[in-house]
Amino acid sequence: MCQVGEDYGEPAPEEPPPAPRPSREQKCVKCKEAQPVVVIRAGDAFCRDCFKAFYVHKFRAMLGKNRLIFPGEKVLLAWSGGPSSSSMVWQVLEGLSQDSAKRLRFVAGVIFVDEGAACGQSLEERSKTLAEVKPILQATGFPWHVVALEEVFSLPPSVLWCSAQELVGSEGAYKAAVDSFLQQQHVLGAGGGPGPTQGEEQPPQPPLDPQNLARPPAPAQTEALSQLFCSVRTLTAKEELLQTLRTHLILHMARAHGYSKVMTGDSCTRLAIKLMTNLALGRGAFLAWDTGFSDERHGDVVVVRPMRDHTLKEVAFYNRLFSVPSVFTPAVDTKAPEKASIHRLMEAFILRLQTQFPSTVSTVYRTSEKLVKGPRDGPAAGDSGPRCLLCMCALDVDAADSATAFGAQTSSRLSQMQSPIPLTETRTPPGPCCSPGVGWAQRCGQGACRREDPQACIEEQLCYSCRVNMKDLPSLDPLPPYILAEAQLRTQRAWGLQEIRDCLIEDSDDEAGQS
């Protein structure tokens, strides 16, 4: 029989042995000769040259296997000043240089969005940040744009329109485009002229201090933006609103200057955190667009994420070893406690798990790679279906589904606001009585304007996640005018289509059978 305390073997260790640290006798795992300087994972020690080759190969492989950027295409690099986006700009800068082995063949530009007003910075602090940003942008040699977030108050409603998307060519079309590009370069080189360095004729370089880009925003717009973010109740809704406005502004700048692609510096770690955050926010239907390599929801401008294979640890090592310049800019969640928002909570959760289980980020990231972009079944399926007013994704909430919580809330709100209507007024169809340019706050208060709830009209044009975030905005007045104008245009367009359907005569089943 077994006895208490009887030993049948050696006792198991209480905790796993620590990972071996690189010593002077250890060599690089790649070249087996040089002394390692960084340890990416347990046992993966690289020397300086091998680590650079490993890092650059990841970036080139991500662009090469997807083949979405054609030669000569204009690409806008969204630079925030952080480590990942700075490393992305540096990779593009080196890839477009003449001494690169496999040179990139697109035309690059850089954009920086000044978000100081949303973060509560003063004009002096914002000017100091811009003074650090402009020398870095000038050093790249790319055409660059510095825009303030306040410019969202001057955007047109067309920024929320999904333009027709050009069909992406097959692999044969991409190879044909490359061959045609190389043939053009050979002809230019044979003519004796200097070859371009970015895939086509070098665009004119911006002046050293372009005054049109350095002008401060209007004080009225700064006050309006501050009022908007101060009116939002939760930090989670503030971060989502900031991301939405930033995306709309970058999208407008890309269209205005002829860019068909936008590169963002989302790293593997950041995308893993974003995946878990979006699941908690109710954006599970859009994970393939929010975390994938390409995001085609905007139609004519495609967002790509070439840094999605690099972890934050690799980015930090590369920037440190090769002196990649970056600028620290405070965000809305800077110095916020861990449980201040869903974004901060998920970030702390993932990073804490990563320290204990080093494969956490890679596991979540590999899961996101398996997500496929598929059309949604139902009335909202297809590219021509209704889209969210803010995130521009296909609506995941059917307006005809009265069993949803939002349908019940909307019906309750409308029943409370609707006043008794005399019989003489029921003979007149309730059509829109205000012009499309009139905002919700300035509507006349008669006819359909009196019976419609502006909050409900906007909520029915939002996806589930954006509806939840809109609950933290007590009033619609602080929203930028282009959002309110587009919401009113969609409402009037839907009313007009419904009126046309009511006037159409449908064939009965008997008449259809006889014909």
Curated annotation (Swiss-Prot):
Give the organism the record lists: Homo sapiens (Human)
Chain intervals for the UniProt region annotation (Disordered)? 1-24, 188-217
Q: Which GO terms describe its molecular function?
A: nucleotidyltransferase activity; sulfurtransferase activity; tRNA binding
Modification N-acetylcysteine occurs at: 2
In the record, which positions carry Phosphoserine? 415, 419, 435, 508
**Its biological purpose:** Plays a central role in 2-thiolation of mcm(5)S(2)U at tRNA wobble positions of tRNA(Lys), tRNA(Glu) and tRNA(Gln). May act by forming a heterodimer with CTU1/ATPBD3 that ligates sulfur from thiocarboxylated URM1 onto the uridine of tRNAs at wobble position.
Summarize the subunit comment: Component of a complex at least composed of URM1, CTU2/NCS2 and CTU1/ATPBD3.
State the family named in the UniProt similarity comment for this chain: Belongs to the CTU2/NCS2 family.
Is tRNA processing a UniProt keyword of this protein?
Answer: yes
Q: In which pathway does it act?
A: tRNA modification; 5-methoxycarbonylmethyl-2-thiouridine-tRNA biosynthesis
Under the heading Gene3D superfamilies, the entry gives: HUPs
Query: What PANTHER family does the entry give?
Result: CYTOPLASMIC TRNA 2-THIOLATION PROTEIN 2
Q: Which cellular components does GO assign to this protein? A: cytosol; protein-containing complex
**What protein does this entry describe?**
Cytoplasmic tRNA 2-thiolation protein 2
